[in-house]
Structure formats: C-alpha cells, structure tokens
C-alpha cells in the first residue's frame, strides 16, 4: 500500500478511536451525573418521608424507587466512565453487558406485562388499594393519587368502591367521611369553588346514581386508555427509556472493537521487531488514558 494511503487509513483509525472514546466518556458522565441527582433527590425525599407515618410497600414509595434507580444509574455509569478513561476491556465489557441485560429485562418485562395484562392490572389495583388504606398517613401517595384522579377523571384503582378500604371512608366508620370518597373524585367545573364534601355518601350507591356526581371508573383503566389514545406520547416515553441504553451498548461495542484493534496492532508490531528490539511506534501519552500511538 502506498505510504500516503497508509497514513490516511491510520489517520481515520485514530480519529474513529478518539471520537468513540470521547463520545463514550460524555455518554457515561452525563448519566453518572443524572444518577447522582436522582439518588440525591430520592435520599432527601426518603428522609422527609420518614418524618411521617408512611406506606410499608416499597412499590408505592416514590422515594424508594428514586433511590434504587439512582443507585443503579450511578454505579453502572461510573463503570462506564472508568472503563472509557482507562481503556480497560474487562470494565468495558462489563458496562456493555450490564446495559444489555437491563435493556433485555425491560423488554421482557414489557412483553410479560402485555401478555398477562389482566394479572398486571390486578397487581396494580391491589397495590393501589393498599395505598388507599394509608391515604391520610402518606403524603407522597396522597399527592400522587389526588393528581391522578383529577388529571384522568377517575376514582380509586378498579373503581370508586376501592375507597371503602380506607378506615375513614368505610361505611361502618364513624364521622362524616364514612361511605364517601375524596373531593378529587368529584365532577366539577374549573370555575366552581371546591366542595370538599361533594363525594360524601356515594360508596354504597350504584354507579348510575352517582355518575353525575363523582367519577366512577377506576384510575388503572383510565391511565391505560389514555396511553392507548396518546400512543405517540407512549412511543416517545419508550424511546426515551430504551434508545439511550441501546446507543450505549452499540457505542461500547464499537469502542471495544477499536481498542482490540489497537492491542492487536501493537502485538503484531512487537512480534515483527523481534525480542529485545525497540519499537519505532511510541505511545502518544500515558497516565489515566491509553492514548492512540502517533
């Protein structure tokens, strides 16, 4: 091969190595910082949550979910940062495999949830009922439930009768809340003054007799129907979750290939020079990074 063509190929190889290296460093660092932020928010929320009597179910504790998500993002991204800086093949492979496993597990989880849709809905409804039992004791769940009921115009998990699981809303309970639902279940115009007593004495009545007063459909089905009607938003959310992980796997795989090519090139060069000979190719730098040779 003419010397000019050889130098051009070498320059392209060097450029691709550096481009992949810095792209992977930026990718890992961004998600490392995001993981640290999510973890910090989760820890702060959990500290605040512990000041009050709260839910025992980790599924319904947003702070616990944030902490777990933050820990996973922080640790995995840290491996990616360290691997890309050191050009360590073992760490790079570990980073790629972890991302790939997470991606596959998410896809499998989605397929299982769709395949066993009825069981998934029952699982969600059961957890919502457990949350309703502690509605007035857990501010996190209360705020989430109130928001969902107002936003999606629904009441309870399966339907409005789920509120009988709460000790204050049970029909046998003393007090004005008995046999009623929270005011966020009520049908009202935005211009009207909020009537916090609008949902009283509705649980023990039939759907048709209260459907003009409160929302009778459950929030689980309401949210599912909303996502089906707004499939573009759902597709955007799925892409936002899955695409970065896929790009991370692809980027790491390409970078591993380039690092292996460099190692192979150096091995061949050293073998041709013979034992004890000084190679003419010198490293461009040392330290935290394995730099591409000049």
From Swiss-Prot:
Q: Which cysteines are joined by disulfide bonds?
A: 154-219, 155-185, 171-179, 186-198
A GO CC annotation given for this chain: late endosome membrane
Q: Which residues lie on this side of the membrane: Extracellular?
A: 45-62, 115-235
* GO terms classed as biological process: negative regulation of Notch signaling pathway; protein localization to plasma membrane; protein maturation; regulation of membrane protein ectodomain proteolysis
Q: In its keyword annotation, does this UniProt entry include Cell membrane?
A: yes
Any one Gene Ontology MF annotation carried by this entry is: enzyme binding
Q: Does the keyword Chaperone apply?
A: no
The UniProt keyword set, sorted, is:
Cell membrane, Disulfide bond, Endosome, Glycoprotein, Membrane, Transmembrane, Transmembrane helix
Q: Which residues are glycosylated?
A: 118, 189, 230
Among InterPro entries, the record links this protein to:
Tetraspanin/Peripherin (IPR018499), Tetraspanin_animals (IPR000301), Tetraspanin_EC2_sf (IPR008952)
Q: Write out the annotated subcellular location.
A: Cell membrane; Late endosome membrane
As for membrane topology, the entry says: Multi-pass membrane protein
By its UniProt entry, which Pfam families does this protein fall under? Tetraspanin
Residues on Cytoplasmic side: 1-23, 84-93, 257-294
Q: How is it modified after translation?
A: Palmitoylated.
**Main role?**
Part of TspanC8 subgroup, composed of 6 members that interact with the transmembrane metalloprotease ADAM10. This interaction is required for ADAM10 exit from the endoplasmic reticulum and for enzymatic maturation and trafficking to the cell surface as well as substrate specificity. Different TspanC8/ADAM10 complexes have distinct substrates. Promotes ADAM10-mediated cleavage of CDH2. Negatively regulates ligand-induced Notch activity probably by regulating ADAM10 activity.
Which protein family is it in? Answer: Belongs to the tetraspanin (TM4SF) family.
Record PANTHER family: TETRASPANIN, TETRASPANIN-15
On assembly, the entry states: Interacts with ADAM10; the interaction influences ADAM10 substrate specificity, endocytosis and turnover.
Output this protein's name.
Tetraspanin-15
Q: Which gene encodes it?
A: TSPAN15
């Amino acid at each position: 091969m003419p010397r000019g063509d050889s130098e051009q190929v070498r320059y392209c190889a060097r450029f691709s190595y550096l481009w992949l290296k810095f792209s992977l460093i930026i990718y890992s660092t961004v998600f490392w910082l995001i993981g640290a932020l999510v973890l910090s928010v989760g820890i702060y929320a959990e500290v605040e949550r512990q000041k009050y009597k709260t839910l025992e179910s980790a599924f319904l504790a947003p702070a616990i979910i944030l902490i777990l998500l933050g820990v996973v993002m922080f640790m995995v991204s840290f491996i990616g940062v360290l691997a890309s800086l050191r050009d360590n093949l073992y760490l790079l492979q570990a980073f790629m495999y972890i991302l790939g496993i997470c991606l596959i597990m998410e896809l499998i989880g989605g397929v299982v949830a769709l395949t066993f849709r009825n069981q998934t809905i029952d699982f969600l409804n059961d957890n919502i009922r457990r949350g309703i039992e502690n509605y007035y004791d857990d501010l996190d769940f209360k705020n989430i439930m109130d928001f969902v009921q107002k936003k999606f115009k629904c009441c309870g998990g399966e339907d409005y009768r789920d509120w009988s699981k709460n000790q204050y809303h049970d029909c046998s309970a003393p007090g004005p809340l008995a046999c009623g639902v929270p005011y966020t279940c009520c049908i009202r115009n935005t211009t009207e003054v909020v009537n916090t007593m609008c949902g009283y004495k509705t649980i023990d009545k039939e759907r048709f007799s209260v459907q003009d007063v409160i929302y009778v459909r459950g929030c689980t089905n309401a949210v599912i129907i909303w996502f089906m009607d707004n499939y573009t938003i759902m597709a955007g959310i799925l892409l936002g979750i899955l695409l970065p992980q896929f790009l991370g796997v692809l980027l790491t795989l390409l970078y591993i290939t380039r690092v292996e090519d460099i190692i192979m090139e150096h091995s061949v060069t050293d073998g041709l020079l013979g034992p004890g000979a000084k190679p003419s190719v010198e490293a461009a730098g040392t330290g935290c990074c394995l730099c591409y040779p000049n």
